[in-house]
Amino acid sequence: MSEWDFAFGLTGQALEDALSTGATYEEWAMIEQELERLIIGDHGKNVFAYIDAENIPSKFWEKITRYISCLVDKWSAKVYALQKDHATMGWHEVAKTNDNVKEIRLCGGPAKNKVDKKIIRDIRRLIGNCTPTETCVFIVSSDSDYRVVVTELKEAGVLVIGIGAAKSNDGYRQSFDQFLELCDG
């Protein structure tokens, strides 16, 4: 790895800034991380991630953690799934091995949007319990059913960041203050 590899992919002013600083890769990465933290600002006091385990596989846990940890130091997550959904059992291991993750398994038979509705109810409850200007919510899903609650959060003054798959539609992506894409590789 060359000391200038960090500049690969940068264009325009960003490339000019990177080359003129004389900073190493590590220093430039730290500068970028601090800039990201400024985006969060006061919203970083209460940070919550709501993960829809039905459409985001547990294999993305490391990327989700990296994305959120680049922006804030302290955060908590809730992972939602149906109790008998074996496809989401990978999230059970994630919750067991991470103190900041709470697993919520919904009982009963499958019903249309059961998990989505529970996540939305919990997010709405959060709005009443936190100071909106000090709160940041990450919604980890590719399901556009969350667009309405994203709008409600933004109107209340909450910073809302989406994390989802590349297949997420443009309207859903644009409803967030920022959208981070999960991709294989």
Q: Positions of the model-derived regions?
A:
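Glycine-rich phosphate-binding loop signature in dinucleotide/nucleotide-binding domains
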Residues: N129-E134
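Extracytoplasmic/secreted cell-surface and envelope-processing proteins
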Residues: K59-F60, Y146-V149, G171
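VWA/integrin I-like adhesion module and closely mimicked acidic/polar interface patches used
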Residues: V150-L182
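Short, internal active-site loops enriched in acidic
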Residues: D85, D143-D145
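Domain-level signal for Mg2+-assisted phosphodiester chemistry and nucleotide/NA-binding surfaces
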Residues: E3-R125, E152-E155, L159, A166-K167
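Acidic beta-strand-to-loop metal/phosphate-binding motif
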Residues: Y80, T135-S142, V149, L153
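Small/polar loops that bind or transfer phosphate-bearing groups
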Residues: D52, F138-S142, G164
